[in-house]
Amino acid sequence: MRIKLEIIGAVQGVGFRPFVYRLAKELDLRGWIINTPEGVKIEVEGENLDVFLKRLQEEKPPLAYIYSISFEYAEEVGYTDFEIKESHSEGKREVFILPDIGTCDECLKEVFDPKDRRYMYPFTNCTHCGPRFTIIEKLPYDRPNTTMKVFKMCQECEREYNDPTNRRFHAQPNACPKCGPQVFLYDKEGSLLGEGEKAIDLAIQAVKEGKIVAVKGIGGFHLICDATNEKAVNTLRIRKRRQEKPFAVMFKSLQQLKEYARPTNLEEALLSSPQRPIVLIEKVQDSLPETIAPGLKRIGAFLPYSPLHYIILSKLDVPIVATSGNYSEEPIVKDNEEALNKLSEIADLILVHNREIKRRCDDSVVKVVGGIPLLIRRSRGYAPLPVKLPYKLKNKVLATGGMLKNTFAIAWDDKVFISQHVGDVENYQTLKSFEEMVFDLMNLYQFEPEIVVCDMHPRYETTKWAQFFSEEKNIPLLKVQHHYAHILSCMAENGIEDEVLGIAWDGTGYGEDGTLWGGEFLVCHYKTYKRVYHFKPFRLIGGEKAIKEPKRVALSLLLELFGEKALDFNLPFDRKELEMLFKVWSKGINSPFSSSVGRLFDAVCSLLGIRHINNYEGQSAMILEDLYNPAVKDHYSYSIEGQIIDWRTTILDILQDKEREKVPSRFINTLAKIALDIARRVGIEKVCLSGGVMQNDPLVSKIKEELTKNGFLVYTHQKVPTNDGGLCLGQVAYVIGLS
């Protein structure tokens, strides 16, 4: 008997073919395996076919991800041996490209073994680890189709590459010091200071001296410095133009990390996972300079994920700040020449290598929210693995996402391929980067969209781009309301097929009525939605300025409550400015209405005198989250009239609360009570939580606790971010409803 199999999934570049080869040999089966653009095809014949099928799925390599298996039985054709055939490049692009994966333990042992030929070699990898997504130029995933094509393997590497019993069998980035990429160190003037081990040692010495070094990694450059050196960290802030936004810190090991932070068991597992994300963890007080994460209880911590990181940290006694190599709000730098031009104004030295990065890919960020890992940024280690839809699409869809924390998606059948993190598409550089990344992903999959979907906001650069693209290609353009897309995203990733109550809370999103939404209760299914409840709208004095200045939102709420008398409150404005802002508010000049819960967090933070200006998105909310005390059980009053949730009594209670330290807890408890109250009124069992506010751990935990004990099923995000980084999935899901 013969069996013909077709496997779709992330099975290329993970040691899958050698695994199948060894399994077939062990079971005395004959036939072949081949990589194709559709995935992997296998034909085997012999006696132990059922055992083969069972073990194929149970014992597959750790990184292999099987999306689907189809097989059929046939007559034997008389194969005499089992072989690995040459790959085919024709056909449609169905293969799942694997993300870049952190260095495995076996490779690490070799890097630090003085007797090994790869001792201290920064580009050591195998089929279980190393770069994938950032080096592949086209499918199928074979060495000539990667940026490793310029490095001809030496005899020893070639022998490993061709040996089906070796873990480097068909490891496309396989290399060693003799034949592979090398590192080079330059000063900011572009003069070469050293290469190889000397380059690394000079870079390490510079870090010890308090200098800043740009280091080329897997998906772009990092800017690194001694994380315990306050002066170095402050210098990096000034040069990078990053006032207070937290820096990530890389530790050499979990053991070292525990001297500075308190990870839970789940957070430890996330830190050590093959994806190696940055994980937001509670820090040990005063263990690191306050300037790393000013005013916050958590730090973004991560472990090394490339041999180069491990080598650098092995020769340092301290953790390092490792932040993206760019100016604030610009795309991460990935090319050597660009680094020498751009990063020389930030870094004192630049450590490059000569393996080209095909596409930039930032570090991923994860936070445990409500006891579940939530992706704050889905990028390296996760992208571009697809998310499965509950239904099949009839058309090929391109979704352009939102403006902030942008990701986009291409989708067909039941698969949504979400891009790596693009960033905030607010300037020319990020828009250009967005466009390059869209065309790159479409080209990689030979994808021609038949429908484009975007956000409804007329001023989003991604919306304007989608309009231009749809006209140029003469294909339909669909616009989806921002908060509906948030809830659709949560529904799609959880495989929900029926109606839900969606609670979409965030900073801002363009509403159907032309106002800014952000405190929404929506009854949703894939075909349509209804806005059933929302927070009472208030004016954002000065529009965009109010988003960056919580004191303006606080003033707006006080004016709603007290009218002109609010000007007599002790407010962080001079009298002249106050009177001008009152005029602007009363006449509605550049002061759009908003129902945003994110802005309510800003206002409360300002009313408490904690924060009047936000230096980065979500800063006030993060501070209030850190001040939450689970021992505080009570909440403030609120009222619901018609469809409107009135926050005015809540704000009055806050103003009269003499226990100021309990205000953040009582405010968060109030929001959870409102969620329960509305859920009961609507009466739909399934409740989806989405939007940037749902990154708040105590808030989500409290909402889940309240709703679950009252019989509701609560769904949150795990596969895509709850912030605008998950919008593109919701935009794709919207197309399901149309068909």
Annotate each PLM feature.
Residues D317-Y391, N590-S594:
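Internal gly/pro-rich beta-alpha loop/helix module
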Residues K258-P263, I311, I332-A339, D363-S364, ...:
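Conserved phosphate-binding catalytic cores of ATP/NTP-utilizing and phosphoryl-transfer enzymes
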Residues I212, G220-K283:
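A phosphate-binding glycine/aspartate-rich beta-alpha loop in the early core of alpha/beta enzymes
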Residues M1-P173, P177-F184:
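Intrinsically disordered, low-complexity, mixed-charge
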Residues H483-W505, G509-G511, P550-L559, S665-N669, ...:
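Glycine-rich phosphate-binding/hydrolytic loop that grips phosphoryl groups
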Residues D455, N474-H486, I703-L727:
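Conserved phosphate-binding/catalytic loops in two-lobed NTP-binding clefts
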Residues Q172-P173, G180-Q182, G402-D440, E461, ...:
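A contiguous, well-structured pocket-lining segment that forms one wall/lid of small-molecule binding clefts
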Residues A214, Q446-P458, I684-Q695:
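Short glycine-rich phosphate-binding loop at a beta-alpha junction
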